[in-house]
Amino acid sequence: MGVRIYKPTSAGRRNMSVSTFEEITKKEPEPRLIEPLRKKAGRNNQGRITVRHRGGGHKRFYRIIDFKRNKFGVPAKVQAIEYDPNRTARIALLAYADGEKRYIIAPLGLKVGDTVMSGPDAEIRVGNALPLSAIPLGTQIHNIELEIGRGGVLVRSAGTAAQLMAKEGDYAIVRMPSGEMRMIHLRCMATIGQVGNVDHQNIRLGKAGRSRWLGRRPRVRGAAMNPRDHPHGGGEGRAPRGMSTPKTKWGKPARGVKTRHNPRFDRFIVRRRK
C-alpha cells in the first residue's frame, strides 16, 4: 500500500495522510460473510462505561474472519483483497475448491490468484496455515493460536509479525512483536508471513473529526478537570499535580506500573517484553 500526504490547504488538511488503497480489489463485502455490528459505546451489560473515549463513528458491518484456518487439505484461491473497517489489516476473500468462501487476514505479498492451504502438509508459503510443529525455525508468522483449536489471537494487527525461535518438548518459543518470548504449544496453528498494510503506522489522522469517524471520543486531561473528578484536578491556573507520581482517575498509580495479573499463564512467558 501507499500513503497519500495532503497539501496544507486548511488546518484540518495540514499533516493529514491517508492510505491510497491501491491493494484493494473489491469494494463490496461478501454478503454471506457479514453480520450486523451493534455499537456498545464502551458500555457493559449494565449500561456503565467500562472503556472510556468510545462512541459514535460510522456504521459498520462485521466481517466474519476465519481465525481457526481449520479446513485442512483443501486448496483455496484468493479472489479479492478487501478493506475491513473493524481492523487495521486488510482481509483476503478465499474461494475453496469445494465452493465455500471465507475471509482471512491478508498477509504481506498475498495477491489475487494465489493459492493457499491449511494443514500440517501445507507448503511453507505466505498465507498457508500450519501447526507450529511443522514450521521451520526462524520463520515469520502471524495469527497465532494460544489454545489448540480456539483460533488465532496473537499478531493480527497491520504490519506485525512474530518469529519462531526454538522448539523444546511440546512447546515452541515464539518472539512476539513486543520482544516478549513466549511458549506456545506445538499443535497450535499459525499463518506464514507478516500481516499486510505495513504503512498503516505512517497514517496521520490530521484532525479531531477523523477520530470521531472512527468512534473515538475526546480524551480529557486530568489536570483540566475539577478535583472531585480526578486527583490531578483543581488549583488556580495551571497548577502542579501535587503528588510525587501521577495517578489514574481512580487514584491508582499511572505510568510504569504493571497491570498484568494472570498467574496461570505466567509460566509460559520466557522473557518479558522490552
UniProtKB/Swiss-Prot annotation:
It comes from Chloroflexus aurantiacus (strain ATCC 29366 / DSM 635 / J-10-fl). GO terms for biological process: cytoplasmic translation. Belongs to the universal ribosomal protein uL2 family. GO terms for cellular component: large ribosomal subunit. It comes from the Bacteria. Pfam families: Ribosomal_L2, Ribosomal_L2_C. Residues 227-239 have a biased composition (Basic and acidic residues). This is Large ribosomal subunit protein uL2.
